[in-house]
């Protein structure tokens, strides 16, 4: 057997996608619903946990306990303004636990709180299972993508989510870099090309400029808006229709979460329709206080509602060009990534900005990132096929990294857009006479003063021998590895004494113990989900057996072959079981199985007696189907009330 493949996962804000490189090409893997992208949603109910399509489909019924957008929380502090402003829009509750955000839900009748890493790990587990179902063997190795804009803490937290999901994360790579790989594979050997990647997804917007030369990718610049995407366009439509509902019906639905959620689902559908048609209609029965809401919207109106958002996508394009020191005429290829790039107006704005240049849409925009991640996974696993052999990947640091020097000045050691992995060393000294130690404070950001940048961590180097200011030599080294994880070391040259920090924990990262605990819990939840599945199938098996027996003895063809007493005996027992089922829908698996045995003891002798003479099926021939419930037997799906 060939060795197990590694997978590439695009962990998106709203949708995720998984791919695998095998037999010389990438397969994007469809989930059990046949969809090639899976909603990044996790829902908790009184009885079970749902992930993906199943979670998103029940969101209107259970908004408080359906979690999405975990990517907007991951690796951030609770007090982060982004978190604070996003919380206003979410129907689920975010609580503060030591300045770490946690999502609070009700699950199986208890209140539970989860870290964003745990929610993301559930989505990753789902993606892992989708791949395993397709490949037919367990998968552990994966490459996971993040926005180019993600800082160290967000990258670390994403990696932790992978670990909790039971994955060995080979590498975290930038989404645009992954898209470039998807694109570059087919494009090797054409001399140097400058490629601009325009990635407008469900929740984030990234513009990246890469140079591809003979299979070598180099990221020249990244820019973007961590908070622009398809959801924002949905919100504009939602607001538009809330106002329309007020005008038509003099009622404000905006405080009714379920109504807004149903409206949002319809808006998302309308938005997708408007990418291919010039008009879309919405029909929502009994949206609010029994009022049906039937309306429509034109593409022109939609473009007008979002015009400022659409136009704002060009600012990061200009910024990236400036950072890469390129003129727009020097860009060879424009690549569209992310579902929202299907919007005709967005395409037109970009095309006009580049004076009518053709856009590259040959890659399915929803799948390009997972495609590239799958290729990268194959490279890291040492895939020998010539398609991937010559590909080398150079990533960049998204923000400058440095330390605070006297007066709160930011002194950058690693400049933004430096190719990583990289290592930079600089000599610093003391600020006052006989200073016994120095405090090394590590920041990321582009501003001149550290107070405007983001503190990553700090540590002391003490025990410096007394000396006049400016004499001691302290060598500081910043070292970023291929995953974008930073090690900072300070060494006193006179004594050789050193101290270092790996930038992780001070960023509110989870500790080893917490990750370990979450891995255990993830296993536990998975086991519970399994028990739930078995319970439901035992219930369905019992239900279908009871209904089958009932219809068997009521069959007209059996008139005269079965005594009324026997018939009554079977019908009474079936009715008893059916009533018991209605009253005990939440019983355990063995209770259902026990009831079924009880029922079989009554029915089997009677039914098999019927067929002794007729040479029909032996005992239990009727409805003794396995847990799946036979053809047309009892409901195998339960309706949610």
UniProtKB/Swiss-Prot annotation:
Chain positions with N6,N6,N6-trimethyllysine modification: 561
GO MF assignments: ATP binding; ATP hydrolysis activity; ATP-dependent protein disaggregase activity; ATP-dependent protein folding chaperone; C3HC4-type RING finger domain binding; cadherin binding; death receptor agonist activity; denatured protein binding
Pfam families xref list: HSP70
SUPFAM superfamilies the record matches: Actin-like ATPase domain (SSF53067), Heat shock protein 70kD (HSP70), C-terminal subdomain (SSF100934), Heat shock protein 70kD (HSP70), peptide-binding domain (SSF100920)
Phosphoserine: modified positions: 631, 633
Region of interest (Substrate-binding domain (SBD)), residue spans: 394-509
Result when mutating residue 10 to A: Reduces affinity for ADP
Keywords, alphabetical: Acetylation, ATP-binding, Chaperone, Cytoplasm, Cytoskeleton, Host cell receptor for virus entry, Host-virus interaction, Methylation, Nucleotide-binding, Nucleus, Phosphoprotein, Receptor, Secreted, Stress response
Signal peptide start-end: none
Keyword Nucleus in annotation: yes
Biased composition regions of type Gly residues, renumbered to the chain: 614-633
Positions of modified residues (N6-acetyllysine): 77, 108, 246, 348
One GO cellular component, as annotated: vesicle
GO BP terms: ATP metabolic process; cellular heat acclimation; cellular response to heat; cellular response to oxidative stress; cellular response to steroid hormone stimulus; cellular response to unfolded protein; chaperone cofactor-dependent protein refolding; chaperone-mediated protein complex assembly
Omega-N-methylarginine PTM sites in chain numbering: 469
Highest taxon above the source species: Eukaryota
Entries under CDD domains matching the protein: ASKHA_NBD_HSP70_HSPA1
Chain positions covered by the region annotation Disordered: 614-641
Post-translational modification: In response to cellular stress, acetylated at Lys-77 by NA110 and then gradually deacetylated by HDAC4 at later stages. Acetylation enhances its chaperone activity and also determines whether it will function as a chaperone for protein refolding or degradation by controlling its binding to co-chaperones HOPX and STUB1. The acetylated form and the non-acetylated form bind to HOPX and STUB1 respectively. Acetylation also protects cells against various types of cellular stress.
Induction of the gene: By heat shock.
Localization of this protein: Cytoplasm; Nucleus; Cytoplasm, Cytoskeleton, Microtubule organizing center, Centrosome; Secreted
Alphabetized NCBIfam families for the sequence: PRK00290.1
Oligomer and partners: Component of the CatSper complex. Identified in a IGF2BP1-dependent mRNP granule complex containing untranslated mRNAs. Interacts with CHCHD3, DNAJC7, IRAK1BP1, PPP5C and TSC2. Interacts with TERT; the interaction occurs in the absence of the RNA component, TERC, and dissociates once the TERT complex has formed. Interacts with TRIM5 (via B30.2/SPRY domain). Interacts with METTL21A. Interacts with DNAAF2. Interacts with PRKN. Interacts with FOXP3. Interacts with NOD2; the interaction enhances NOD2 stability. Interacts with DNAJC9 (via J domain).
Family: Belongs to the heat shock protein 70 family.
Domain statement: The N-terminal nucleotide binding domain (NBD) (also known as the ATPase domain) is responsible for binding and hydrolyzing ATP. The C-terminal substrate-binding domain (SBD) (also known as peptide-binding domain) binds to the client/substrate proteins. The two domains are allosterically coupled so that, when ATP is bound to the NBD, the SBD binds relatively weakly to clients. When ADP is bound in the NBD, a conformational change enhances the affinity of the SBD for client proteins.
Name of this chain's protein: Heat shock 70 kDa protein 1A
Species per Swiss-Prot/TrEMBL record: Homo sapiens
């Amino acid at each position: 057997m060939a060795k197990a493949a590694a997978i590439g996962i695009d962990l998106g804000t709203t949708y995720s996608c998984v791919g695998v490189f095998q037999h010389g090409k990438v397969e994007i893997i469809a989930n059990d619903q046949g969809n090639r992208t899976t909603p990044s949603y996790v829902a908790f109910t009184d009885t079970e946990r749902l992930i993906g399509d199943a979670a998103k489909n029940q969101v209107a019924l259970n908004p408080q306990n359906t979690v999405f957008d975990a990517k907007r929380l991951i690796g951030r502090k609770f007090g982060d303004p982004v978190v604070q402003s996003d919380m206003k829009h979410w129907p689920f509750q975010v609580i503060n636990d030591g300045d770490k955000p946690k999502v609070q839900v009700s699950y199986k009748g208890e209140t539970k709180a989860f870290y964003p890493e745990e929610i993301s790990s559930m989505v990753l587990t789902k993606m892992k299972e989708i791949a395993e179902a397709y490949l037919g063997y367990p998968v552990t190795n994966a490459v996971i993508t993040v926005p180019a804009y993600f800082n160290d803490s967000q990258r670390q937290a994403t990696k932790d989510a992978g670990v909790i999901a039971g994955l060995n994360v080979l590498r975290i790579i930038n989404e645009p870099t992954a898209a470039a790989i998807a694109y570059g594979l087919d494009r090797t050997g054409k001399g140097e090309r400058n490629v601009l990647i325009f990635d407008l997804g469900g929740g984030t917007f990234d513009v990246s400029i890469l140079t591809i030369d003979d299979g070598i990718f180099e990221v020249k610049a990244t820019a973007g808006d961590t908070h622009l995407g398809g959801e924002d366009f949905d919100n504009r439509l939602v607001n538009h229709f809330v106002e329309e509902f007020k005008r038509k019906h003099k009622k404000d639905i905006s405080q009714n979460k379920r109504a807004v959620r149903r409206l949002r689902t319809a808006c998302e559908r309308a938005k997708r329709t408007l990418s291919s048609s010039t008009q879309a209609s919405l029909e929502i029965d009994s949206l609010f206080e029994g009022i049906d809401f039937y309306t429509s919207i034109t593409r022109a109106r939609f473009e007008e509602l979002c015009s400022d958002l659409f136009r704002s996508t060009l600012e990061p394009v200009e910024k990236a060009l400036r950072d890469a020191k390129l003129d727009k005429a020097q860009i060879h290829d424009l690549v569209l990534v992310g579902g929202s790039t299907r919007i005709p107006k967005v395409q037109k704005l970009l095309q006009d900005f580049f004076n009518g240049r053709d856009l590259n849409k040959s890659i399915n925009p929803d799948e390009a990132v997972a495609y590239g991640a799958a290729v990268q996974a194959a490279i890291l696993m040492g895939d020998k096929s010539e398609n991937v052999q010559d590909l080398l990947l150079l990533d960049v640091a998204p923000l400058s990294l440095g330390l605070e020097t006297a007066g709160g000045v930011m002194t950058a050691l690693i400049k933004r857009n430096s190719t990583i992995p990289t290592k930079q060393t600089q000599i610093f000294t003391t600020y006052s006479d006989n200073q016994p130690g120095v405090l090394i404070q590590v920041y990321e950001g582009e501003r001149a003063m550290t107070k405007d940048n983001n503190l990553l961590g700090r540590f002391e180097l003490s025990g410096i021998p007394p000396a006049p200011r400016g004499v001691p030599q302290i060598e500081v080294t910043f070292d970023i590895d291929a995953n974008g994880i930073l090690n900072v070391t300070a060494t006193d040259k006179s004594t050789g004494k050193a101290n270092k920090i790996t930038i992780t924990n001070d960023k509110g990262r989870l500790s080893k113990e917490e990750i370990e605990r979450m891995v255990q819990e993830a296993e536990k939840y998975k086991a519970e989900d399994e028990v739930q599945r078995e319970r439901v199938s035992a219930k369905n098996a019992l239900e279908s057996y009871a209904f089958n027996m009932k219809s068997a003895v009521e069959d007209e063809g059996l008139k005269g072959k079965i005594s009324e007493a026997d018939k009554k005996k079977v019908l009474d027992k079936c009715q008893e079981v059916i009533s018991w089922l209605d009253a005990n829908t939440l019983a355990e698996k063995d209770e259902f199985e026990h009831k079924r045995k009880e029922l079989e003891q009554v029915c089997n002798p009677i039914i098999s007696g019927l067929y002794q003479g007729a040479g029909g099926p032996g005992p239990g021939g009727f409805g003794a189907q396995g847990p799946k419930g036979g053809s047309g037997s009892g409901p195998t799906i339960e309706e949610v009330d």
